[in-house]
């Protein structure tokens, strides 16, 4: 049985070990799997986003769930107070916000839609976002799965990641994971951190996801500001 806390923290802040260092030839975000673990977590080599690598480093000592929930909570507070989206600040000036215990932003105590664990929903969202700009053929998928087999995950966790990577991209299914507006904000923010939207397909994916999550008007800009603050 998958341990949601372990999988989530392994992805965002665990000590993954993997041979590598040479390019795998895989495209886009998924191709960085072969470059080795970065940011202290497994998701660094799986995804191409510089933001998520730095997020993994920031999550060390706090836990990825707490930091992600805190960033979404800060965005929600600023949006609710009708503040202008805050520009990114230098790391020394940027405190790590943490959500109140058992609040709607506390991923460790919340369930996703259908009763699943909210942390698993976030991992699914990040993997889906990584596929937004890629078309993986059968040979590339086999190479990617071989690399996943070398990661520090147990059998069920590897199977989960492989299954999520193999699924067709379905933004509606990802949006349906959110049980609350607060979870919708966290899912969008996690998806944003998983990619650097410099490709029109990535930007279109995030826009579509925001619409399907029914994020309140103006909130996305605040979530984007928090993503920009992860430096």
Predicted regions and their residues:
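Primarily EF-hand calcium-binding motifs
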Residues: 127-129
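Small-residue-enriched hydrophobic alpha-helices in membranes
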Residues: 2-124, 140-231
């Amino acid at each position: 049985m998958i341990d949601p806390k372990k999988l989530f923290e392994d992805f965002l802040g665990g000590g993954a070990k993997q041979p590598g260092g040479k390019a795998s030839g895989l495209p886009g975000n998924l191709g960085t799997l072969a470059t080795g673990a970065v940011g202290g977590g497994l998701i660094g080599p799986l995804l191409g986003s510089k933001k998520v690598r730095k997020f993994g480093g920031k999550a060390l000592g706090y836990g990825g769930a707490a930091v992600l929930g805190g960033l979404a909570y800060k965005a929600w507070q600023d949006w609710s107070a009708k503040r202008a989206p805050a520009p990114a600040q230098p790391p020394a000036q940027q405190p790590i916000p943490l959500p109140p215990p058992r609040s709607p932003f506390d991923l460790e105590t919340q369930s996703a839609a259908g009763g699943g664990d909210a942390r698993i929903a976030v991992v699914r969202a990040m993997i889906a976002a990584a596929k937004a700009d890629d078309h993986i053929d059968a040979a590339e998928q086999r190479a990617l799965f071989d690399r996943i087999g070398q990661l520090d995950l147990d059998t069920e966790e590897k199977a989960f990641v492989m299954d999520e990577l193999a699924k067709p991209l379905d933004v509606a299914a990802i949006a349906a994971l959110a049980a609350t507006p607060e979870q919708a904000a966290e899912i969008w923010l996690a998806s944003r951190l998983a990619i650097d939207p410099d490709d029109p397909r990535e930007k279109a994916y995030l826009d579509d996801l925001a619409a399907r999550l029914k994020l309140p008007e103006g909130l996305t800009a605040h979530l984007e500001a928090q993503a920009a603050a992860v430096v």
